[in-house]
Amino acid sequence: VFAVYINGVAEGWWHAWGEKPTVAATTTPAARPAPSASSPTEAAMSGGYQIVPDGVLVRPTEHAASTYTKPELPEEAKENTERGAELAAEYLLDTLTYAWNTGDTQPFEDITQPGEKFREGHIKNVNALYANGWMYGNKTTVTNIVSVLPASEKEWGVEPNTIAVVFDGTTNNGIACVGQKIIDKNSDEPVTYAFFMTWKNGGWISTGGSVLNNEQK
């Protein structure tokens, strides 16, 4: 969902905070906490945000990574059924949202197969963002279950015991910081998610994934 997001400012796709606004007036602006009087970096400010010594803007305390709860896999998602595959795919989306909001990709890694393109691309981009920034307010909502069906090994080239799960939903990239630039993408966008969920070693794991926006459909 966020594959090119962190490169947006550098490429000129989105304006940084303080430049010509592109966000609707109804969008809630990012919180801008004042620095502590005892802070050694209180003189270093950018757009109302305090700058820490490494040059990155300070993340608002009320949106700290610690305010996000790590997702838990539902018990029914541990069952070798189509419903189990569906719930495991929804959990996967929860772990991806958690990764963007916290920088912790481990739950997402645990539910996806190493080497798979969707998995590796998102892990790379989350790590790149948190090497020089942060994000909060990222969220994904499933609005419709399009299909949950067994996937043919012959037709799709998938592994045995694979269920294809397709969701319609919305995604919101929230507020991100890249270095000293704030990127406000706090708006819902319609998307379609598709996952190959494979039953392996006693549990569901994603062996393929994709997300399409309206322009890509």
Language model: regions and residue ranges:
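Juxtamembrane and targeting peptides
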Residues: 2-87
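A short, amphipathic edge element
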Residues: 131-153
